[in-house]
């Protein structure tokens, strides 16, 4: 309680002191010693009208405080200085010292402070970089560093021994004694638990070792960990410094910190109590200083200065009024003497403009330049305007002269000697721009102008051609209208006609060939501009930059030859030769844009004409001209080669696209006219004109492509950059070649599919012709094939011709275009892929044809078995081949003739498929009608049917496939089975049997006698032996077409083999037919096919 009462007493005392201080008179009173001061010496001058700057007298504490917190030492020094100002004598001495150092003797301190405030901005620029004389020149960061170094250089005090109780066992003992260390190394932990390493900011205790010095702490973290910093973070301090400290130690440290704080508060209060008078004195001193500063600001100049200045000003004005006439006359005399001397001194200068003009008009350029340089060397007074005007006239004359010289450099026919003299004169005249570079720019612009002129002329010619074409179209339209009306028009009518007849510009077809001719001439003219001007331009640049101006002159004379010997090595321009090369590259870029746009506009219909190839040849010639010695820079040659490769690539790509487009075009124009055997080079395929047109397209396009690739390959040997482009071009050509074949195959497949659909929609067929096609008007070309089946055969022939002849021929002819970049195995695989594609396509179209013919054959086979006028259950005796069999054979004869004439190489394959289908049709019809029309077959019917089947097999044997043979065996077995069943049923039910005919008496002697399979086969063999050869001779004319590949002498043994197979399955007479079905019966020899 006593401490609280003491605190209350101290606060009351402090409040009472402040109230007394507030009642004091704060006005400034001059000290008694001020009357004893010496008078102040002051120069008479105009008092400054500017307002006094109060801020100049105040020390710059605010700016410093805004940046950093001032140290205790600095605060003490500033307080001492302020206290010293309050005394009168010290103030006077300080003012004198400051006034003497600034050169203003006798000035008061207030005036000096004001002058400093005013002249602060003037002093800013006069600082020599030494010690700063004002606060804003102080490097505050450097000042803070120095203060920190001063603090760290001091030694840390020895830690006082902490009085306290003995620690409990297990607790960390606080440090009792530590050696004093440098301040920059360690500082004491505020909790008195150890020492904090200032570099690593780690706690050092008696039990722990020194932390690692390799660990570095950034400034941001240091500001948060230093406890006397403004940015101190207590949580971060405890988590880092005391991360290993126990809770008991932290509590003990916190208790010690609180007791220390309490002790310090007591000490502060005691300090205020003991030094209360000192604090009051300080407050009084501060108030005195403030009042003195305010007075200084109110009267900065002192008394009497303004009056003295006004008196002196009045005296000066009266003196000027008295002596003014004398001064004027003296000034006029001085001016006259000055003008006279100037005229005498610069008389040559006044004649200089006329002298220079005379020299220029006479062609004495060197004399004019010398006079000009002489005038430039004269040192003229800056205040004489007449001389300036004379020099301005000289400059005007020389400016016109320089313009004349620059104009002469634009002459395209200027020789190198004149050019050298012109450049030398311009260099002596010190032009604003480089004359040599001006000349090079002029020549470069001239080349660009020539290129643009070519473009303008080309557009004008194209426009004239379009107008002529349009006028011709109008006249043609008028003539057609006259012919339609049949009336002769008068002049008036013709004028009305001009107004009436209008032709749409879009409908007018402009002559693409003539336009392409103009485009070719345009590219040729552009290339000629480059070839004729770029090498000369480059040689001129080389001569200029090598210092040998006249050595590359193409227009030389004797004087030029003499000048060549005297030319010295010198550099005429500040630019480099690489910049000239950049000019040429830009020119070639302009040329490239024009050539590429024109080349892409060539009409594709004229692609085989020489316009595009001639343009490429022109660019190639330009490349060869550029490759001559010192003709152009290497970069220009590379750029032109690139242009050649690009337009060649465009041309080849357009050729490839033209081949594919032409392939599609000719595929839509199939005329169905078979070509002669000579036109197809004795090929067995009766092709149309379509494959030959395709061949013509491919050959025309690939020959042009081959020539272009060969030319590019020869140029690529000189440049490695073109190899990649050539490889890309070759790959695209190969793919385009193969795609053309695939596209043609796809078109042939579409044609075949369309023909198949047209045949499938037809309901009635009559000998291979549909009624629809029979009624087709004769609008087709004479000699064209109309029958859809024959057209399918023609498509098959076209496919076979492409597969067997055309693909290999064209591939072997043009494979060397891309063969070097590919392996031989890959090369052969391409051809095999083409052949496989056409083979697969041929199979598809062949299916369409055989399907259409199979319908005819099925109808004929059905008529043969069911509608031939014979009852197979009561057939007459076998006497030979029936007419129905011959009619059936005629169907195959017609097919044979059709295929032989249209696709002879496919004859065996087609007939083999059709015959196999015929046998399958027989088998299908027998199975379908087994319970109806063919449920009963007697012995004579069996012999007749088996005999005719053997006849078919003998005649068509050369086209029989293994599958057809197996089907025939199945058919024979089925017929045998039906016959045996029919005869067995007749024996079992004799009442229902018909009376045997006369022809059957030899076959069946007793109705109740059963007939075995061997007996039926024996009867069939007997008929075959007696009648087969005879029937073959009788129908030799009908079957002659089938005998071409298989002679008649080889046919008789064939049925024997068939019967032997039957006989092998019926060897045991004791076994009935049912038991033999599982042991080799021809019925189960092959699955039945519908």
Curated annotation (Swiss-Prot):
Biased composition, class Low complexity, residue ranges: 45-69
Domain of life: Eukaryota
Keywords linked to the UniProt accession: Cytoplasm, Exocytosis, Phosphoprotein, Secreted, Transport
Modified residues (Phosphoserine): 180
Biased composition (Polar residues): 1058-1082
Biased composition (Basic and acidic residues): 109-124, 998-1009
Biological-process GO terms, alphabetical: acceptance of pollen; exocytosis; Golgi to plasma membrane transport
GO cellular component: a single term: plasmodesma
Keyword Secreted: yes
Region (Disordered): 18-128, 759-783, 987-1010, 1046-1090
Phenotype seen when the gene is deleted: No visible phenotype under normal growth conditions, but the double mutant sec5a-1 and sec5b-1 is male gametophytic lethal due to defect in pollen germination and pollen tube growth.
Subcellular location as annotated: Cytoplasm, Cytosol; Secreted, Extracellular exosome
Main location: cytoplasm
Coiled coil: none
Keyword Secreted: yes
One Pfam assignment: Sec5
First and last residue of the signal peptide: none
Family indicated by similarity: Belongs to the SEC5 family.
Function comment: Component of the exocyst complex involved in the docking of exocytic vesicles with fusion sites on the plasma membrane during regulated or polarized secretion. Involved in polarized cell growth and organ morphogenesis. During cytokinesis, involved in cell plate initiation, cell plate maturation and formation of new primary cell wall. Probable component of an exocyst subcomplex specifically involved in autophagy-related, Golgi-independent membrane traffic to the vacuole. Regulates autophagosome formation and autophagy-related Golgi-independent import into the vacuole.
Assembly description: The exocyst complex is composed of SEC3, SEC5, SEC6, SEC8, SEC10, EXO70A1 and EXO84B. Interacts with SEC3A and EXO70B1. Binds to EXO70H1 and EXO70B2. Binds directly to B1L.
Full protein name: Exocyst complex component SEC5A
Taxonomic source organism: Arabidopsis thaliana
Top-level taxonomy: Eukaryota, Viridiplantae, Streptophyta, Embryophyta, Tracheophyta
